[in-house]
């Protein structure tokens, strides 16, 4: 299997994101490797050796997606027996010309703990954990968004992803079996109606998920799952709560759609 490397003298997050995005366009399997914090000559040489071995083992040149601030270490990597893609180089010179200023590359600047976005994200993660699954309903005034939906529709992972990636304070509240007889917005959520965002899911997918968690129970029964999905979607429509179906979406896609629908400010950068 052909190898793909994502490497950097920083976190390698940028290389991973761009590299995976490009490779996802092709119906081919790859053996993925991430090497971060290549900050010394020794580490660069070790990475080069690893890449060359992967090329030799796979029979085809490894693909290397990289971002380097240090020119010497970049040159070592670029001498590998591999096909290389430098994500920064094509854009730096045109930007320098447009901005009329020379770039001053600094490692870790994008993902530094000294950035304000880091503080936003840590605070948002703490908020998401404290306000997960309706465990705390007393401080929704701090929420940027409140995700609602039936159990196992994707509320918790979406809340945490919004917090960790974008610094958005996302609470979430579940509609349970006890709510279904006369489903309505709870009194403590009514003052925050504009913050509500609904998640729904196809009944069959919900059955499959719940069956893996609590097989042969009322909770995972087809009748229960279909009823809950039907009632919660009726509530969304009656109360004009925006909502999306999460059945075929990854957590990245779910949160991207939430951000698009709500227009929430991102604190990532």
UniProtKB/Swiss-Prot annotation:
Keyword list, A-Z: Kinase, Nucleotide-binding, Serine/threonine-protein kinase, Transferase
Broad class of enzyme this protein falls into: transferase
Signal peptide feature range: none
HAMAP family: PSRP
Protein species of origin: Colwellia psychrerythraea (strain 34H / ATCC BAA-681) (Vibrio psychroerythus)
Lineage, top ranks: Bacteria, Pseudomonadati, Pseudomonadota, Gammaproteobacteria, Alteromonadales
Name of the protein in its database record: Putative phosphoenolpyruvate synthase regulatory protein
Catalytic reactions on record: [pyruvate, water dikinase] + ADP = [pyruvate, water dikinase]-phosphate + AMP + H(+); [pyruvate, water dikinase]-phosphate + phosphate + H(+) = [pyruvate, water dikinase] + diphosphate
Positions with a binding annotation for ADP: 149-156
Gene Ontology molecular-function annotations: ADP binding; ATP binding; phosphotransferase activity, phosphate group as acceptor; protein serine/threonine kinase activity
EC number: 2.7.11.33, 2.7.4.28
Function text: Bifunctional serine/threonine kinase and phosphorylase involved in the regulation of the phosphoenolpyruvate synthase (PEPS) by catalyzing its phosphorylation/dephosphorylation.
A Pfam family hit: Kinase-PPPase
Family recorded in the similarity comment: Belongs to the pyruvate, phosphate/water dikinase regulatory protein family. PSRP subfamily.
InterPro entries: Kinase-pyrophosphorylase, PSRP
